[in-house]
Amino acid sequence: MEPNIALIASLIGDQARSKMLTALMCGKALTATELALEADITAQTASSHLTKLVEGELLVVRKQGRHKYFQLKDHQVAELLEQLLTLSAAHSSATNSSTTNLSTSGASLKQSTGPAD
């Protein structure tokens, strides 16, 4: 069976799921309710997302009494998320820098293209 990068990317790429995965980076196991709060979604929506993450083998679930606790499957998942967070932060910095440079050069352009006397 060939690796399916697109599947993993789509699982991580959803904003609610990425928030839940990021919340689990602390190493603790959290309930669906706790993860729903982290992702700012309903418990029902969180349950659907968590099922996808478990089926996609990014999370494991364990029962303790009547509660289910979710945690990252292993260190490889944590390392992948850490790399994506680093890449995302670098990309955000580069994008903000480019936007600032464009805004500054646009302001200079407006100043230098005034009407001729």
Residue ranges of predicted features:
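N-terminal helix-turn-helix DNA-binding core of bacterial DNA-binding proteins
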Residues: P3-T42, K68-K73
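Key DNA-contact positions within bacterial/archaeal DNA-binding proteins
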Residues: Q44, T51
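Alpha-helical residues within the helix-turn-helix
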Residues: L37, V54-E55
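Beta-hairpin "wing" of winged helix-turn-helix
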Residues: E55-Q64, Q71
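Terminal, regulation- and interaction-focused segments at domain boundaries
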Residues: A107-D117
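N-terminal functional module detector in eukaryotic proteins
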Residues: H49, Q64-R66
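Conserved segment of winged-helix/HTH DNA-binding domains
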Residues: P3, C26, Y69-L109
